[in-house]
Amino acid sequence: MQIIEIREPGQAESKQEVKIAVGIDFGTTNSLIAISVGRKVKIIQTEDNKELIPTTIEFTNNNITVGSNKGLRSIKRLFGKTLNEILNTPALFSLVKDYIDLQSQEVKLNFANKQMRIAEIAAEVFIYLKQQAEKELTTEVTQAVITVPAHFNDAARGQVMLAARLAGLEVLRLIAEPTAAAYAYGLNKNQTGCYLVYDLGGGTFDVSILNITEGVFQVIATSGDNMLGGDDIDKIIADYFCNKFSLLDNLDTLRLAKKAKEALLNQDNFEFNNISLDKQTFEQLITPIIGRTINIAKECLEIAGNPNIDGIILVGGVTHITLIKEELYKAFKVNILSDIDPDKAIVYGAALQAENLTTPNIDSLLIDVVPLSLGMELYGGIVEKIIMRNTPIPISVVKEFTTYADNQTGIQFHILQGEREMVADCRTLARFELKGLPPMKAGSIRAEVTFSIDADGILSVSAYEKISNTSHIVEVKPDYGIDTSEVDKVLENAYKNAKLDHAARLLQETVIEAESLIFNIEHAIKELVDLLSENEKHIISSLLNNIKHAIDARDRALINNAVKDFKSKTKKSLNTKINIVISDLLKGKNINQIK
């Protein structure tokens, strides 16, 4: 919202302070920084005229150097990761094996003659980008819009924001990388419709489905594979060279493969020291990889409800390969948008959004989505989903829960992430307790729970109880990050176990209802002890034992039959007496009562 300063008549107009806002693409391999003025984007160059700045940090001669292609690489992959996760993931451990402090309880690297956290090291990249922008623009740069992968969770996003703040940058907004690319095309081309963003980088593949309508960008589905990218193409070519020309499987061959890949972007043949590769063979080699990306894109469309797409936006340097455009067109028969250099599309969108947030009367809005469902634990270990996967953000959802036991003075809240039905199969995000509640009958206390996700994708959960005026709020920062492959694994397990999960949930709900019936009947019998004959007590006890045995057998049909048998055999002779007491006990209770 624009703030307008109101002055007294005749008061001199002071010169407005100008704050420079830039867009930053903090990439795994390379980073870029750009500024937009009048919706015209300019990418900031280094002193040696480079736009793509290697995301590397090196410490030599008591100085930290960024962009030297040496030292610590791919630090972006470490955002949001725990020490255990890094140690147990070879691909991550190999990045930091020469730096990591194994004695620490958290992720710390021995770097620059001291222990540094990931955010502190990443801040050096932001500092370097900021300095390059200030040199070229000859003014201080204080604000930025920064892009992050669509699947970055709260912990990873939080570390990006911390790194930027340590570099002296105010983060105006974090936006998903595919959203940024779509934003660049939406404003530059004035597009409206539904678009598929195809982002194939060096080591990862991301695909998103976006609606773009009247300046509103909404991600409606995301998918991808974080182990698929240009590096795989290099490996396939290297293997071909090893088999065809008896080369050694080493780094030199891999570099030669990369050189061949880049050469074949603009020519039909590659030759080097009697090693050759023609474009036709090259395309035959990489067709399986391109096919995998297209299958993932089709699956993402299914998740989105199979909308008709109006175009495909290309992102990532690998999409310079002509065959990718051709195969995408064959598969989807829509326009391929590649007017903006795929290497630069993301930073273009970030720069345009930075201008949008600092310039009056630009009304475009970006909306990302929740990658995995968020919910709470209910009584019995059941998961109640509060915000569903692929829900657009920002979002706020309010639900009411109640106590399940008499004289309960606290409610425990267990916040979860995942698509499964039971707590044991989902990821714990946070736990907290609302204490100091007045001791009252079960169901009398009502707690209002609010799940809120802001525009940066940060989740906060609050609980409020009106009678005691007690409240608690927690900003959820998961213990470890979640990337594309983990999201895909969660979804795959959810689909694979859908029937079993549904059956498990129905069984648990049936058990809870049966246990509630047993509790209330036994409580009622104590109140009716003088009204019931010994024969009636025996019948009730026997029927309740049948229900208990069925519960122990974990057989839903058996439980339902035992409950049905109890109700039918006690309906006429006992219903009136029992209802005198249990009608009050059951008031306000339902299956969704939580711990």
UniProtKB/Swiss-Prot annotation:
Sequence intervals crossing the membrane: none
Q: Which UniProt keywords apply?
A: ATP-binding, Chaperone, Nucleotide-binding
State a single Gene Ontology molecular function.
Answer: ATP binding
Q: Which Gene3D superfamilies does the UniProt record give? A: 1.20.1270.10, 3.30.420.40, Actin, Chain A, domain 4, Substrate Binding Domain Of DNAk, Chain A, domain 1
The answer, when asked if ATP-binding is one of the entry's keywords, is: yes
InterPro entries reported for this sequence: ATPase_NBD (IPR043129), Heat_shock_70_CS (IPR018181), HSP70_C_sf (IPR029048), HSP70_peptide-bd_sf (IPR029047), Hsp_70_fam (IPR013126)
Query: What the protein does?
Result: Chaperone involved in the maturation of iron-sulfur cluster-containing proteins. Has a low intrinsic ATPase activity which is markedly stimulated by HscB.
Q: Which family does it belong to?
A: Belongs to the heat shock protein 70 family.
Protein name, UniProt field? Chaperone protein HscA homolog
